[in-house]
Structure formats: C-alpha cells, structure tokens
C-alpha cells in the first residue's frame, strides 16, 4: 500500500490534516482529523471484505483518508467541505509520484466519493456501479465511525437522532 503511505506523507495532505486538528482543538463535537480518517478507512475496508465488494484496498483507503480534508477550507473560508475536499483530493492524488498514481477511473471514483460522501445512502441496497458503491461505503463508514451512543455532547449535537450512531455495532 505504498500509494496510501505516499498520501499520508503528502505535504498537501499533512497541511490540511494539521489545519483541521488546530481548528478543532476545542471542538465539543466530533472531530475530523487523522484518527477519524483512519477509523473510516478501517471500517470501510471491513465492510468491503464482509460484503465481498469489488473495490481495491488502495481506492477505499484513499477515499476514506481524503474524505474530510475540505474541512480545513470550510473552517477558513466557509466553503462547503465536500466541494473543497474534492479539489484538495485531486491535488493530493495528482501530486503522487508517477509510479504511484491511480488509474483515471480510480481517481474519478475517489474524487466522487469525497464530493458525495454526505449524500443519500441506503446501506441495504447494493449500489449499481463501483463509483456509487464507494460513495455509499464512505458515507456509511463515516457515520459508523461516530460513537454518538457514548458522546457527552450528544444532546447538543445538531445531527438528528435518526442520523446519529446510537449503537455500538460493526
């Protein structure tokens, strides 16, 4: 998984992760730093294996690691983090050494997952294509990564109870 290591070492990735972690240092609610990105990646990969989905580990991990990078821009400028995140994800992916670059279809899937990870998702429905499958997988894993059931800020959270992860499950 040298490509994933290269993403984690990318100056662009590190700059945005650092900016998120600084911006959220006093945040009462869920955070979006490296620990969250890794949680999403690991949960997503477990779901791929359990459901026997035709997605590569590199693509799943890349989408998960990059999915919230746009938060840095959202905090700085107010830009929607999905929009900013897609742009930042492209910058990270395109900055990889030539031998580690993703194929065009993989690149498109990763960027679509970053841009669409907050959209509609029904975990019980098998997405038609690999791109839709990845988008739904990242959204589901993002939600499952949240320990709302044990959160001290749960009552003050703007998420509806339907959206909150109220059970320890995986």
Annotated model-derived regions:
Residues 1-170:
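Metal-dependent phosphohydrolase cores
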